[in-house]
């Protein structure tokens, strides 16, 4: 099994005022994955311009000081989740267009955090989809946080890679970024 991480900066336009897909890159990446035709793969993507601006705007992961701040955070968490789901839908659709049986796996449905770090995750559905020959597609997302003074946290695609790698033991992890080169050691 392979875990492929596609950075949000590769598939979205970070300099855009509004969330915007880099359609050319997304199509190319989906085509390259189809051409490689891996037998078992999990794809994780970053949020890029679909997540980061909203998470910052609403202070997701920050300590909550009062009820008004909590209402703002709760709403902002829902807004951020909505935008990253839209990005995930675009990515799954591009993969489907290439004949890849992609299935969305929103982290908010199977992960809990504590102080912004993954505390628990039920990966059984991901494992089941892999056994059926499907391609789980997960992403950086807003999840519930067990810390009562935080309540919601951002779990990054990088955290997902680490957690999935420890639990699922892939043969290979591939990182796709907008930086040229190949890492031979941890940067």
Which residue stretches match the model-derived regions?
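N-terminal glycine-/serine-/threonine-rich phosphate-binding loop
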Residues: 1-42
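Short beta-strand segments
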Residues: 3-7, 44-45, 105-106, 137-139, ...
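Active-site glycine-rich loop that binds ribose-phosphate moieties when present
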Residues: 27-30, 118-124, 152-164
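Alpha-helix C-terminal capping segments
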Residues: 35-36, 94-98, 163-171
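Glycine-rich loop at the start of a catalytic domain that most often binds anionic cofactors/ligands
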Residues: 48-64
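Ligand-binding beta-strand-loop-alpha-helix segment within the catalytic cores
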Residues: 59-142
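Active-site rim beta-loop-alpha module in soluble metabolic enzymes
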Residues: 131, 137-145, 179-187
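Acidic, metal-binding active-site segment of PIN/NYN-like and related structure-specific nucleases
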Residues: 164-187
């Amino acid at each position: 099994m392979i875990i492929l991480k596609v950075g949000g900066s590769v598939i979205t336009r970070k300099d855009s005022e509004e969330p915007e897909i880099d359609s050319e890159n997304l199509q190319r990446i989906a085509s390259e994955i189809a051409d490689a035709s891996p037998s078992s793969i999990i794809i994780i993507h970053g949020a890029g311009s679909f997540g980061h601006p909203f998470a910052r705007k609403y202070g997701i992961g920050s300590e909550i000081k009062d009820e008004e701040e909590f209402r703002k955070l709760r709403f902002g968490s829902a807004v951020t989740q909505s935008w990253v789901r839209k990005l995930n839908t675009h990515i799954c659709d591009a993969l489907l267009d290439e004949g890849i049986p992609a299935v969305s796996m929103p982290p908010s449905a199977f992960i809990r955090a504590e102080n912004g770090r993954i505390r628990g995750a039920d990966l059984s559905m991901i494992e089941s989809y892999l056994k059926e020959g499907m391609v789980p597609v997960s992403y950086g997302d807003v999840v519930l946080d067990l810390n009562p003074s935080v309540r919601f946290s951002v779990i990054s695609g990088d955290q997902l890679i680490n957690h999935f790698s420890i639990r699922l033991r892939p043969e290979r992890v591939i990182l796709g970024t907008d930086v040229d080169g190949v890492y031979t050691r941890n940067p």
